[in-house]
């Protein structure tokens, strides 16, 4: 589901890219549920450097109430 959601967001945002200020980067993290995960390796290889990333929005599939979206600022789960 993670990959499908990010690909869906990429498809939608690509249709309105001329109305989006700045650059949007879609990052697919390998091994995000398996320790040690892939985030640190990606950071060490420069995924946040070119283009420079100013903000990240993450998404995770989590069982909950149908039709409800939970969110918060700052670190959560493995972030």
Language-model features, listed with the residues they occupy:
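Histidine/acidic-residue-rich, glycine-tolerant segments that coordinate divalent metal ions
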Residues: 1, 7, 13, 19-79
